[in-house]
């Protein structure tokens, strides 16, 4: 059974609480826009595509419960303005808000059914797009390594079924390679400080029985001789190809460049923000210090981390009290370090000026 981060059925929306993974699976009911804002802000749902889908579906659910005499246009516009504040770096959310608000302005008070249809369409289209992204990335890598049948690939953060409607973007490339028999091995970084790699990506790889190894973020340079390519997702790609993604992505791009290995960004075309000329214009979200200075998990009683004494999670401090904390959620990787960008429309490579052209 495939993992589902989002379950939607008519007027009911459920999201998998990713803060509890990998030890506990619990779905949270999202009944309105405020619920959606909360699960996005708290990172109970994360990943740029999933954030946009949950936001859109929460508005759809709200519209289904909105009284007939209420102003649907005003509701849609105000709801998306509010939701945009939940994660300011995720361009998919902003693009979805712009699109849906445009429909509301065009259709006026009669926008209800159109908004609901478009939100539901997003859920279906995202899954289809993810399969196409996986195929595009796989084809690029196999063309790059014409003399190799099996590749070893490293990924960062979580870009799989838990970050999308299903299959994933960068993890979708790994899945596509695995399905075609072209994956030798996958490596995933733990992705400090929120550990999306060790909690979520490792969980997906084990679930799908994909041969994989978890490594610390600081291990990557020492294993680059084993790695054929690095694949990552994106929260926002600017017009020239600069890419904002989970903190630590920039480090990996520098390593890939140093070792002469392909560095692939995988993202739906909706993650490309052509209104921004370069990465210097991207707003970088700062996370609360407690996410870096503490760690959360269940109590264990043996050295193999397998015997869970109590599934209840506890939070413990791991930093000196009083230390100042700088914890950006994302960094920006310059376009000249990116070998290719895989989208549902195919893959894009650098132009002669080391920049990208998405026209």
UniProtKB/Swiss-Prot annotation:
The enzyme's E.C. designation: 5.3.1.23
Active site (UniProt): 235
Keyword set includes Transmembrane helix: no
Gene3D superfamilies: translation initiation factor eif-2b, domain 1, Translation initiation factor eif-2b, domain 2
Pfam families on file: IF-2B
Pathway as given in its UniProt record: Amino-acid biosynthesis; L-methionine biosynthesis via salvage pathway; L-methionine from S-methyl-5-thio-alpha-D-ribose 1-phosphate: step 1/6
Known function: Catalyzes the interconversion of methylthioribose-1-phosphate (MTR-1-P) into methylthioribulose-1-phosphate (MTRu-1-P).
Record family assignment: Belongs to the eIF-2B alpha/beta/delta subunits family. MtnA subfamily.
Name the UniProt record assigns to this protein: Methylthioribose-1-phosphate isomerase
Organism from which the protein derives: Schizosaccharomyces pombe (strain 972 / ATCC 24843) (Fission yeast)
Gene behind this protein: mri1
């Amino acid at each position: 059974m495939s993992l589902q981060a989002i379950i939607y059925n008519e007027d009911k929306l459920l999201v998998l609480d990713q803060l509890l993974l990998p030890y506990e699976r619990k779905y949270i009911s999202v009944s309105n826009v405020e619920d959606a804002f909360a699960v996005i802000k708290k990172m109970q749902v994360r990943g740029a595509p999933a954030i946009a889908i949950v936001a859109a579906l929460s508005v759809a659910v709200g519209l289904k419960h909105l009284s007939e005499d209420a102003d649907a246009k005003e509701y849609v516009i105000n709801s998306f303005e509010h939701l945009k504040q939940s994660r300011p770096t995720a361009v998919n959310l902003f693009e979805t808000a712009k699109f849906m608000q445009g429909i509301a302005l065009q259709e006026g008070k009669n926008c209800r059914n159109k908004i609901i249809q478009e939100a539901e369409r997003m859920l279906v289209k995202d899954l289809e797009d993810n399969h196409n992204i996986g195929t595009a990335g796989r084809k690029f890598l196999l063309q790059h390594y014409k003399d190799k049948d099996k590749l070893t690939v490293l990924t960062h953060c979580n870009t799989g079924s838990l970050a999308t409607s299903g299959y994933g973007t960068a993890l979708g490339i790994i899945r596509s390679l695995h399905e075609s028999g072209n994956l030798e091995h996958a490596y995933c970084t733990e992705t400090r400080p929120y550990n999306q790699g060790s909690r979520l990506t490792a969980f997906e790889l084990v679930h799908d029985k994909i041969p994989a190894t978890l490594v610390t973020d600081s291990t990557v340079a020492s294993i680059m001789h084993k790695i054929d390519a690095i694949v990552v997702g994106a929260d926002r790609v600017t017009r020239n190809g600069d890419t904002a993604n989970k903190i630590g992505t920039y480090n990996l791009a520098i390593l890939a460049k140093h070792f002469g290995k392909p560095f692939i960004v995988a993202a739906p075309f909706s993650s490309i923000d052509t209104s921004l000329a370069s990465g210097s214009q991207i707003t970088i979200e700062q996370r609360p210090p407690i996410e870096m200075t503490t760690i959360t998990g269940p109590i264990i009683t043996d050295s193999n981390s397998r015997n869970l004494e109590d599934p209840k999670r506890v939070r413990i401090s791991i930093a000196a009290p009083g230390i100042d904390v700088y914890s950006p959620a994302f960094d920006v990787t310059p376009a000249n370090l990116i070998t290719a960008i895989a989208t549902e429309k195919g893959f894009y490579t650098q132009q002669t000026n080391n920049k990208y052209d998405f026209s």
